[in-house]
Amino acid sequence: MAIANKNIIFVAGLGGIGFDTSREIVKKGPKNLVILDRIENPAAIAELKALNPKVTVTFYLYDVTVSVAESTKLLQKIFDQLKTVDLLINGAGILDDHQIERTIAVNFTGTVNTITAIMSFWDKRKGGPGGVIANVCSVTGFNAIYQVPVYSASKAAALSFTNSLAKLAPITGVTAYSINPGITKTPLLHKFNSWLDVEPRVGELLLEHPTQTSLECAQNFVKAIEANQNGAIWKVDLGTLEAIEWTKHWDSHI
């Protein structure tokens, strides 16, 4: 997918990886970049607008833990304004295994609800034009960081959901792929808790291993967007982009 002249919605586009990715997207010249985030950051929005004045950058307050109905109301405003949306990026995520319910609500349920809401506008069975979904999951969806099992499980769930969406594309007209960052230097990595405090130093321990910068991650994120491969499971790690082959151990045969 060429990003130029596209209409893009980016949920959590002002976070660590999210903001660097928003910068890289704006450089590519979309027609509209609509950022949905739960915290206002006028300086960040102003920076994006200045980076490429030809791009219309719009911000709406959005908490992914709201209901499908509330998400649909906001999306209706956006579709009324833009008429069409080409790409939805779901980037919301928290890493704090002390907050079990919120971790699941943000990392998994929120993604499901946002996508369920946008299907009202995209689903070809309802006369929609289809669309593309990029879900930010995690390499912990491949193999858990066992000291943060709630986070890891929530990301595995998001990955599984994304894989299913891709297989449903012939029915819905909506394609999907996942972006799975490895250990990336962001504020998220420094401010989290392990489940039941099983490893108080888990953040420090992770940073003792090779990492990538959020800019490196963002640049490869944009390459994945441009590749636009339905069903792709992208590993974005150590400054590289790699499509993962998923191993099938069981088949429903339906």
From Swiss-Prot:
Keywords: NAD, Oxidoreductase. GO terms for cellular component: cytoplasm. The keyword Oxidoreductase applies. Its EC number is 1.1.1.1. It comes from the Eukaryota. GO terms for biological process: alcohol metabolic process. The active site is at Y151 (proton acceptor). InterPro entries: ADH_Drosophila-type, NAD(P)-bd_dom_sf, Sc_DH/Rdtase_CS, SDR_fam. It catalyses: a primary alcohol + NAD(+) = an aldehyde + NADH + H(+); a secondary alcohol + NAD(+) = a ketone + NADH + H(+). SUPFAM superfamilies: NAD(P)-binding Rossmann-fold domains. It is an enzyme of class 1 (oxidoreductase). It holds the Pfam family adh_short. One of its GO terms (molecular function) is alcohol dehydrogenase (NAD+) activity. NAD(+) binds at residues 10-33. Coiled coil: none annotated. The keyword Repressor does not apply. Substrate binds at S138. Homodimer. Belongs to the short-chain dehydrogenases/reductases (SDR) family. PANTHER family: 15-HYDROXYPROSTAGLANDIN DEHYDROGENASE [NAD(+)] (PTHR44229), ALCOHOL DEHYDROGENASE-RELATED (PTHR44229:SF8). This is Alcohol dehydrogenase 1. It comes from Drosophila mojavensis. The lineage of its organism: Eukaryota, Metazoa, Ecdysozoa, Arthropoda, Hexapoda.
